[in-house]
């Protein structure tokens, strides 16, 4: 989901409704499984319900906006629980039961040793993860897609997806708790 070997990275992943296997709910956190790391990264996380099932090429980015932003801040990757690091969202995200776009923008500006994330094969011919990375400038979906800099970011498409977990409140309404 992020490339720690570069100062900046921008990735989008599509998880299908069949993979998530929930009709709807509110996502309160997102977790990724990885090898041990001892660094802190500055991340922006975006979630978006989508009809999109795959990416057509290495720069087929989906437009994301501030309305899709669910987390913005530092994440300590050394705080693993059974190999997973968790990002608690600022507000629960309303998942509609369809495909889900997960977007991670690493704004750290510094690189670490290359750390590997666990993944699974999506399909031999379906690109479900795309990622761009560079040492020269902060990436957004626009400049990752267009490559409009003199130092073009490296962009790749993958036929795999990072292993992910969602903490989810099931149902169409957030619970309301009354305190007297």
Where are these regions (language model features)?
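Beta-sheet-rich sandwich/jelly-roll-like modules and their strand-loop junctions
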Residues: 1-54, 107-175
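Aromatic- and Gly/Pro-enriched, solvent-exposed loop/edge beta-strand patches characteristic
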Residues: 22, 42-125
């Amino acid at each position: 989901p992020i490339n720690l070997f570069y100062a900046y990275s921008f990735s989008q992943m599509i998880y299908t409704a069949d993979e998530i296997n929930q009709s709807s709910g509110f996502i309160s956190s997102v977790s990724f499984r990885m090898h041990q790391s001892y660094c802190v990264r500055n991340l922006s996380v975006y979630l978006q319900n989508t009809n999109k099932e795959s990416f057509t090429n290495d720069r087929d980015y989906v437009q994301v906006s501030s309305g899709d932003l669910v987390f913005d801040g530092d994440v300590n990757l050394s705080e693993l629980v059974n190999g997973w690091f968790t990002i608690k969202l600022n507000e629960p995200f309303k998942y509609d039961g369809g495909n889900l776009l997960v977007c991670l923008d690493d704004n750290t500006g510094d690189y670490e040793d290359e750390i590997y994330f666990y993944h699974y094969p999506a399909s031999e011919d379906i690109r479900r993860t795309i990622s761009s990375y560079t040492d020269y400038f902060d990436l957004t979906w626009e400049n990752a897609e267009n490559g409009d800099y003199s130092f073009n970011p490296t962009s790749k498409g993958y036929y795999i997806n990072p292993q992910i977990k969602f903490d989810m409140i099931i149902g169409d309404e957030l619970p309301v708790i009354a305190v007297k």
